[in-house]
């Protein structure tokens, strides 16, 4: 651990199209090998497809999707007395957001549609409607936390 105190959070610049820091964050997660232009193209094209699918404001659909998949509880492994316990704990708001964004990109890459834009648009629309793989992932995380409620007193 660092002895020089806490590290300051680096602030990201809002993206030029939607003026949103959240959009910049997901673009940075999509980005591979420093190709930010390509990541931006993928995300903006996906939002255009979301607009054609839902006939609604794409950034609002994206926010809805993110709110539907952000976990409130998670389990963390704690070693006590030679045993590992899955201890449920609340998720901080920043971590909630970053987990949601990472899950979107991870499951988009695993899906088997034709292009990344189509896959991303499909995942966003599904999550905004409250179904799909991402919502199941969140429910599974909550179920694990609920099942291990007995170990909640081991929290740190």
From Swiss-Prot:
Subunit record text: Part of the 30S ribosomal subunit. Contacts proteins S9 and S11.
Any GO MF annotation of the entry: rRNA binding
Name listed for the protein in its UniProt record: Small ribosomal subunit protein uS7
Function: One of the primary rRNA binding proteins, it binds directly to 16S rRNA where it nucleates assembly of the head domain of the 30S subunit. Is located at the subunit interface close to the decoding center, probably blocks exit of the E-site tRNA.
GO annotation terms (biological process): translation
Alphabetical list of CDD domains matching this protein: uS7_Bacteria (cd14869)
Gene: rpsG
Matching HAMAP family: Ribosomal_uS7_B
Upper lineage: Bacteria, Bacillati, Mycoplasmatota, Mollicutes, Acholeplasmatales
GO cellular component terms listed in the entry, alphabetical order: small ribosomal subunit
InterPro entries named among the record's database cross-references: Ribosomal_uS7, Ribosomal_uS7_bac/org-type, Ribosomal_uS7_CS, Ribosomal_uS7_dom, Ribosomal_uS7_dom_sf
Pfam family, one: Ribosomal_S7
Family recorded in the similarity comment: Belongs to the universal ribosomal protein uS7 family.
Keyword Transferase: no
UniProt keyword terms in alphabetical order: Ribonucleoprotein, Ribosomal protein, RNA-binding, rRNA-binding, tRNA-binding
């Amino acid at each position: 651990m660092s002895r020089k105190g806490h590290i300051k959070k680096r602030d990201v610049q809002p993206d030029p199209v939607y003026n949103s820091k959240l959009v910049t964050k997901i673009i940075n997660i999509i980005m591979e090998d420093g190709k930010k232009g390509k990541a931006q193209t993928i995300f903006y094209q996906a939002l255009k497809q979301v607009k054609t699918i839902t006939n609604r404001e794409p950034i609002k659909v994206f926010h809805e999707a993110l709110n539907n998949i952000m976990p409130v509880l998670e389990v963390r492994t704690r070693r006590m007395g030679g045993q590992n316990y899955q201890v449920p704990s609340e998720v901080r708001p920043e971590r909630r957001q970053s987990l949601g964004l990472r899950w979107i990109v991870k499951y988009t890459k695993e899906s088997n549609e034709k292009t990344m834009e189509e896959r991303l648009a499909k995942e966003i629309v599904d999550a905004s409607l409250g179904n799909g793989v991402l919502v199941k992932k969140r429910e599974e995380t909550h179920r694990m936390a609920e099942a291990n409620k007995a170990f909640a007193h081991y929290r740190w």
